[in-house]
């Protein structure tokens, strides 16, 4: 099958890979677009793994305020000041800040979660499953699945991206590392919401942010 310029363009837009890399992947995949995308993704992930050990000490702190009701500060690091000034990097950090406003994660990644919190959640879920009358032999597997779901809800890198739920924030970060060519790291964030911790009328500001991001 002949590889057309339109095919190369489509794959390039989808993956952010170089033109020659796209052409090689399409040739290797005999023109199969999905297979070519997978080949590039695998190569991109390999490149990301090599970059992961490099120190990312530059970057930016981005702020996002939604209607004076929700505020977010997030620090995302890059290896160089040059990348920190790159518009694509800035847009990515802005998206992360808005995502945090919308979803209210508690941690950046799983290894930040206190093991005692996980243990307490396991105990609660085990009791809940047994009270539901579930057989003991399947309770452990059920609890494992529910703990995984719990961690996905509270850890930023595991959350489905508000703008595109087919990918997680972790996937998005990996894509940006492969595309930009530097190690990037979401280091920390803080989120404030007016009246947080005070009993008040229920208002879903997070849903408002998600709708705004979808525009």
Curated annotation (Swiss-Prot):
Record carries keyword Ribonucleoprotein: no
Gene: tsf
Keywords: Cytoplasm, Elongation factor, Protein biosynthesis
Disulfide bonds: none
Localization in the cell: Cytoplasm
Designated name of the protein: Elongation factor Ts
A single GO molecular function term of this UniProt record: translation elongation factor activity
Organism classification: Bacteria, Bacillati, Bacillota, Clostridia, Peptostreptococcales
Family label: Belongs to the EF-Ts family.
Primary localisation category: cytoplasm
One term under GO cellular component: cytoplasm
Species this protein is from: Alkaliphilus metalliredigens (strain QYMF)
């Amino acid at each position: 099958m002949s590889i057309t310029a339109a095919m190369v363009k489509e794959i390039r837009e989808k993956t952010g890979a170089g033109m020659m890399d796209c052409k090689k992947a399409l040739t290797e995949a005999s023109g199969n677009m999905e297979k070519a995308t997978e080949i590039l993704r695998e190569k991109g992930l390999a490149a990301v793994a090599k970059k992961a050990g490099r120190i990312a000490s530059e970057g930016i702190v981005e702020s996002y305020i939604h209607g004076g009701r929700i505020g977010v500060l997030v620090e995302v690091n890059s290896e160089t000041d040059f990348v920190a000034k790159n518009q694509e990097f800035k847009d990515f950090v802005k998206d992360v800040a808005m995502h945090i406003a919308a979803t209210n994660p508690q941690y950046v990644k799983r290894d930040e979660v206190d093991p005692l919190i996980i243990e307490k959640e396991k105990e609660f879920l085990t009791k809940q499953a047994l009270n539901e009358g579930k057989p003991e032999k399947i309770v452990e597997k059920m609890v494992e699945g529910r703990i995984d779901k719990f961690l996905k809800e509270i850890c930023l890198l595991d959350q489905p991206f508000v703008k595109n739920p087919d990918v997680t924030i972790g996937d998005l970060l990996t894509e940006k590392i492969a595309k930009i060519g530097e190690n990037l790291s979401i280091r920390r964030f803080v989120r404030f919401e007016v009246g947080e911790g005070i009993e008040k009328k229920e208002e879903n500001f997070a849903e408002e942010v998600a709708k705004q991001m979808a525009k």
